């Protein structure tokens, strides 16, 4: 080994080689081309065709013998390595192969690199001779292609047949063309070689589960109930054919793919849309969402009262009111026509309307108008009826009327035996001490015709003969239209009986006047002449005699304009006012049976037996257009009947 000293001399050129983590061979370094030994460097040397070191280390016969093995090894290494090829000689390549065949050690570097292995098959640098041997790469084809052929020749471990195909064969092989699940398992173990050794419980869990899945997921298999008790079902081939192979999974009826459910859901959606469209079309005003309220414009249709009683929107409840009030609130009715109907009062929320009430179409015809006059004529001699109502500025208030029956010998202000307690909000008031002012804001400039006076024949008689007053009262009014803009009106609506004229306000109640007084004196202050605080108040009343053949009630217009604090005016609510109720009793009202003063500031409000402060704070202040305060006008009041007052201000923020 005379070459050992020479190898030691060239060791400094191979300092980057000691890398035991990879032992990459060859290392593409330019220093390799300057080395004198071809065996020490696997890289091709500069270009010497005959290397004396190679001839000295290995005889030429052995080098020629190794060349064939080297070429076969190169064919295996072609696919895994793709290094740039450097030009070299055949002798250098043969010498490198010989060095690998001697033991895999770097024989030239035994002194330093004894532990560095160079396995020839995995890391060969394809030297230059590869380009001279084109038939070498096809040699790798059979080696690499054999596993691919074996894997592509079979779809499954037992062959090309799928589970569904095996199940089909099993069912067809039976005499009755049907098998139970356990019989299918037995056929698999007996007929398919792959499953012969997999019949036990431990090794059969996987493929048996696959068979169950294929039976349930393929449409070509159907399940038939077994006649015997305690026996599993039969599995048969679908006589209709079904789909061969895998079909889409058959899911249970769900919301997504069930056609019947989709159809029923579509029908339900159509019904819901039609109901919503019908409700939206019921009202022509911005308050159409409250079209089923008795006082809304949409409620004055031919719908019966029982429909109103059965449908009550959530927005009318106390828990979901708009501004915190306890009474439902309607939107402004500015876009109503001249003939549209205003609503003055809402029904009480705590009471339910009777379902046996007549419909509007039955009680609003002209024939019932004449019957109303006859009924009113019956009342003119024996009794007079006083109705006390209250309404908020935008006609947005629930009320329960107070009925007072007085004999002819007594005045209108005498105590009455029958009444119904007035309730509003949280204030509890005595009904006889509660005769508030009726206010209504209206910007109309023309009178609306008295097109409906809702009273059925004989209902007024029932009012007199009944032991207790009716439980509900819905009062609606035709558009008055005489109020000035930005003003509140005090209406005096007097409906005269047949052949009677409007007398002075101080007369007895022998005339058939049904009044809505804005102030009601204590029964102890009953006088022959109605006087507010002892004052005789001037008034202007336009009366017209009622003729026997007229079908419309004659109105009495009493426009009054009373200046009140901070330029707030209260002008008369003149025009026609037809009053109707759920019970069908027609009532007409005069807001003042007394003479009104020209200036209300001079009145002694202490003697008024109504809670004016509660009314102003709770009712009048709820209107959006009202912005005033009565603190400096209303002194400390003492009510003779102990009226419970509330200082809560329900003004919407």
Swiss-Prot record:
A GO term for molecular function? protein phosphatase 2A binding
List, as start-end ranges, the regions of compositional bias called Pro residues. Answer: 119-140
Low complexity biased stretches: 35-64
Chain positions of motif Nuclear localization signal: 249-251
Q: Which residue ranges are recorded for the region named Disordered?
A: 1-64, 117-156, 232-335
Region: Required for interaction with RUNX2, residue numbers: 361-457
Annotated spans, Sufficient for interaction with NLK: 281-561
Polar residues: compositionally biased ranges: 307-324
One GO biological process term: positive regulation of DNA-templated transcription
Modified positions (Omega-N-methylarginine) are 249, 251
Motif Required for interaction with SIRT1 residues? 460-464
Residues with PTM Phosphoserine: 210, 216, 232-233, 247, 254, 285, 296, 317, 320, 323, 327
Q: Where in the cell is it found?
A: Cytoplasm; Nucleus
Q: Carries keyword Ribosomal protein?
A: no
Give the residue ranges for region: DNA-binding.
209-216, 232-235
Quote the PTM field.
Phosphorylation by NLK promotes nuclear export and inhibits the transcriptional activity. In response to growth factors, phosphorylation on Thr-24, Ser-254 and Ser-320 by PKB/AKT1 promotes nuclear export and inactivation of transactivational activity. Phosphorylation on Thr-24 is required for binding 14-3-3 proteins. Phosphorylation of Ser-254 decreases DNA-binding activity and promotes the phosphorylation of Thr-24 and Ser-317, permitting phosphorylation of Ser-320 and Ser-323, probably by CDK1, leading to nuclear exclusion and loss of function.
Give a yes or no for keyword Cytoplasm in this entry: yes
At the top level of its lineage, which domain of life is listed? Eukaryota
Q: Where is this site: DNA-binding?
A: 156, 163, 223
Q: Where's the DNA-binding part?
A: 157-233
Q: How does it assemble?
A: Interacts with LRPPRC. Interacts with RUNX2; the interaction inhibits RUNX2 transcriptional activity and mediates the IGF1/insulin-dependent BGLAP expression in osteoblasts Interacts with PPP2R1A; the interaction regulates the dephosphorylation of FOXO1 at Thr-24 and Ser-254 leading to its nuclear import. Interacts with NLK. Interacts with SIRT1; the interaction results in the deacetylation of FOXO1 leading to activation of FOXO1-mediated transcription of genes involved in DNA repair and stress resistance. Binds to CDK1.
The task this protein performs is described as: Transcription factor that is the main target of insulin signaling and regulates metabolic homeostasis in response to oxidative stress. Binds to the insulin response element (IRE) with consensus sequence 5'-TT[G/A]TTTTG-3' and the related Daf-16 family binding element (DBE) with consensus sequence 5'-TT[G/A]TTTAC-3'. Activity suppressed by insulin. Main regulator of redox balance and osteoblast numbers and controls bone mass. Orchestrates the endocrine function of the skeleton in regulating glucose metabolism.
The protein's name is: Forkhead box protein O1
